[in-house]
């Protein structure tokens, strides 16, 4: 907490496991203020995870046999953590959704991660001698239909599933094509689902153009019926539609910010409507966008444009600080997923295509 310097939760704990004592450290990405809605981190300061880990590991090491870091940093940052804090024996990671079939070893530290969406159960067996980890066996157990149901979990799922099934299973329309919301795609390039969503945003609020962070699109929809549940899966966040007014130079800055990390996956990569732009990945970040066309005309730096976006981006989420100086014209309060559902109901059957709105010069 900025005001007191106190942590908002437990940073570490010591837990007896059989005849061993295990220390567990919790670490999250310092990018949190950029990848969540700014209102969620008001009054908080994110400390450097490596420096925090060094302090906690030094404190725990004399008390425990094993130190486990439970992290949400991503595989690359986990490697850096392992190299910087060798006192950590095991890193159980997340954030990058990396599926590690066996542990990655950095020095004497073992890094494991199961992928995403509960597709795998991680199994880890440690062998200790004289208080030191001397061997680790790690593997992934795929969670398939062959895995026996857990009675207590089944009871909970059945209870809530019955209440939700009727609503989420309601068909609102259909698509004749795959709606591409794959993580690797919406974070690096234009997709037909990104086009569809931003078209709906632009039409709903009546803006010149629309932008939506790719990281807010969480799944694809297969060709066939579209249900309310499908739309919730694609757009699980409670983002609402906002219409702002901003200068062309700020819009250009937003597009540069969108492609600054390309070809790396980036949750802030923008899906767009009402504009087309070309960028050159060989150029330095901040100077990659070469052409921008809005409504058939070249972008004018000093011209004012109306932009539809979501409240996360409008508040500066994903590092879009230029939106914080934009003039908010309308805060609709309408959920983005509700706008999408209404559109699909009205259209009945859809078949959006990629239109060449975003072009990378290769």
Where are these regions (language model features)?
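Acidic, metal/ion-coordinating pockets
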Residues: 1-162, 186-200, 210, 260-263, ...
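Feature captures C-terminal
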Residues: 10-12, 133, 195-362
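Generic structural detector for well-ordered beta-strands
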Residues: 14-16, 125-127, 178, 245, ...
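Short, solvent-exposed loop/turn motifs
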Residues: 21, 110, 182-183, 276, ...
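Short, compositionally biased low-complexity segments
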Residues: 29-30, 165-176, 227-229, 308-315
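Generic signal for short, ordered secondary-structure residues
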Residues: 32, 39, 180, 230-233, ...
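Short amphipathic
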Residues: 137-140, 171-178, 243-245
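Glycine-rich phosphate/diphosphate-binding loops and the adjacent beta-loop-alpha structural elements
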Residues: 170-192
